[in-house]
Amino acid sequence: MIYDIKDFLKKFFSSRLFVLAAVIIFMFALLAERVFTLQIIKGADYQKNFIMLIKKPLSIEASRGNIYDVNGELLAYNQLAYSVVISDNGSYSSTKEHNRLLNKELNEIINVIKNNGGSIYNDFPVVLNDDGTYSFTFTSETSKKRFLSDVFGKKYDKLEYNKALGFDEANASAQNIIDFLSSDQNECFDISSKYDTQATYDIVVMRYAIKQNRFTKYKTTTIAKDVNDSIVAYVNEHSDTLTGISIEEDTIRKYNYPEYISSLIGYTGKISTDEYNELSKDDDSYTQNDMVGKSGLEQYYESYLRGKNGEKQVYVNNVGKINEVISQKNPVSGNDVYLSIDIKLQEATYKLLEQEIAGIVYSKIKSGEIPISDVYFALINNNVVDLTHFNASDASATEQAIYNSFSGQLQDALSTIDSELESGTSGTASMSEQTLDYFTCVMSVLNDDGLLLSKQIDTSDSTYASWKAGTLSPRDYLKYCISKQWIDITKLDVDQKYADSSEIYTALCSYIKDAMTDNKDFAKIIYKYMVNSGAVTGQQLCLLLFDQGVLDYDDATVSNIANGSISPYAFLMDKINNIEITPAQLALDPCTGSCVITDVKTGQLKALVSYPGYDNNKLANTVDADYYQSLREDKSNPLWNYATQEQTAPGSTFKMVSSTAGLAEGVIDTSSKINCTGIFTEISNQPKCWIYPGAHGMDNVSEALRDSCNVFFYTTGFRLASKDTGSYDDENGMKYIQKYASIYGLDQKSGVEIVEKTPSIATQYPVMAAIGQSNNNFTTISLSRYVTAVASGKLYDYKLMNKIVDADGKTVKQYDSKSTDISGTLTQSQWDAIHQGMRMVVEDLHDVFGGFTGVEVSGKTGTAQQVETRPNHALFVGYAPSSDPEITIATRISSGYSSHNAAAASRNIISYYYNLESLDNLLAVKAEGVNASGSSAITD
């Protein structure tokens, strides 16, 4: 046995197998030693180094501060919400598979979100319009250039004509962008043609957002915010099949009283690149995912409201998933901002102003000054009814009938255009109104689309002059434009090298026909004539209001309209009377207004109203693209702040400035009498008083303010212009008017913390400037500041902020009343004369303030003409109580016909403020109870 073993070992050690075994054992020993060194001896060091490579910081956004009114009523706050998010960290065998599966998954979750009443988070700068076209939403050229650079992956100055794509990258249209990103080009999204237009757009929006996080895949991309329980449940239940999609807790910005306060507060949204670059200069804690104030006080007080972001350190694996949170620094909440605004007064002022405007519209329809056909068409023209739904698969019978009729009219209109372009020889001046409207739209589209190179047109050219004079046909003009190279042929389907002028013109005609076929403005022109001819009836339009959900469906009313028991006229008048259809929706004159109420003792703003308003909840957090587009297309322009941005002549409200100038410079005194004969004959154009052919007779300054006597103030302006030299000098007169208007602050902004236009004092014609005409141009808030100075002798710097309080309740900033004392401009007796005149104005307004007791009011009316084709603007400025003013009010109703209408709205607002009547009682009279007055003629 032993010998056998020895023999075996002898043979083994002497064999080649031994050498092989020895080598294997040696190598295994080396491997064991290496593993021991890596894991035991140096394991901690390698682990540490590995962790440092994948340790990532994540910002925790601070809770934004709240906004309150002066009484602590909550206006803006944060609400806990759930968001659907995605991390693009799936594993795919190829780029093609990645695109296909990710697009499919996004389409699935987007459909779930939409089918359950949600909407996708969309800050993509291209919107899909109702008519299926795309447009950009940029607010600056810089933003657009940066976007194009990002899309095409190169610096903007390197963008050029791309032969493969067929367009110039630097001038890419919104449609070009969607087509490019949807394609299978390098780093594009390869979206299948099986997806319809809306689905393709939604996928592009999401894929582009995901692309922004391509270098930080551990960060999530938001698909939808503030989703409901049904969507949350779906995502959680399908988490095993929805790759990278999950639910996250979030906060969203919410606003109370949105319609009444949106023009002041504004809204928040995701920070843009431009905003990030600007804000980061002063605060490097901003990230490109932060929510910031986009407009209004949210933007102005961003640094106070924002708070301080926290941070957490995390470990992420090689595909970007978070494995562990290793530390966290909690954020610090933002400060709360308290406004000087009383929201209840703000709301009441808005409603009473709206009722006054509705009352004017109601009375003008009733009198026939606004034809009922204009009201019918307004429902189409201002998009109250949705034209794009007329041919939808679920269109109502009424919608289908209107669309069928429209289709025939569209073909007739296109035939008219074809005929004119093919053989028309008559100038536009001899065209029918309808055909002229068609070609006005055609030329507008060519200009907007960039085909007509308007900057290259020689306006001194004789042929161009003939076109402007209406003696040239569209056919001849467009052919001439081609010959002068005023047409951009790169946008036409022609061979740019070899096409002759005839081929270019044929292509241009084809372009026009295609463009008009799908143009919304052109469709509205056709509908206007269909309404006027009865091809679309008032009955049909009234039924559409129910079919499309503009009004709550009511079987009995619908039946009565359909069978003729209720006429369209009676139905619409009832809805206007009850303000179920608002002046803003109709966008007829008048449809806008503003009012500012100020505390005379402190200069604080108690109400600053712009009508109409909008729902800033739909623009905050993520913009509701459809809603935003509807606001942009709304002819009442609700995004415009009519209190701080609209400028008009002040009309006779300016006469306190002229009184001040005349008294201070000694060209009149408190007892001076000027004889009004109804006409002023000292200058060549011989302007008339509003009372002409009547006359006011002898008036002193107080009586002239009461009567709003133009001749008195023409004379004052004339005397100021003649003061220094004894002879009339236009420039000299303007020097004095500008001096005293400036004392009242009418050459500077009020100081309010939102967008405001700078008022401008007239620069010519002192005689006309003295009655508030010439080129005087003021905002409502500048008139408020002016009348507050008249009432108090102080020119205040306005502010909307009352105080700012931190999270612990400590006041960090307090409103400090700042003013300039202007009381020394006049003697007390001169001030008294002006104040007496303003009191007499109100006492003389029997149709407005007759029977008004409880508080004495002083004021001044003003009617300002802007254009002859529209009604005059209605203005009123005043204060109360007359003997010891507490508040001032400045009201403007744009195109409001008569100043009495602005005075009536002011009366009701003052009545509410002093608790003389309840808001319910004031609103109970409805539109028909408003004593709307005035024509388009100036009456004061």
Positions of the model-derived regions?
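Active-site SXXK
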Residues: 34, 72, 106-109, 235, ...
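Conserved catalytic neighborhood of penicillin-recognizing serine enzymes
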Residues: 335-336, 375, 380-440, 446-448, ...
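Second-shell loop/turn segments in exported
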Residues: 54-56, 86-99, 217-225, 285-288, ...
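Conserved active-site-proximal loop/helix segments of enzymes involved in bacterial cell-wall
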Residues: 77-80, 88, 670-707, 752-759, ...
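Active-site beta-strand/loop architecture of penicillin-binding DD-peptidases
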Residues: 65-70, 256-276, 280, 289-295, ...
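Mid-domain, small-residue-enriched loop/turn segments at the edges of structured enzyme/sensor domains
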Residues: 592, 687-693, 725-767
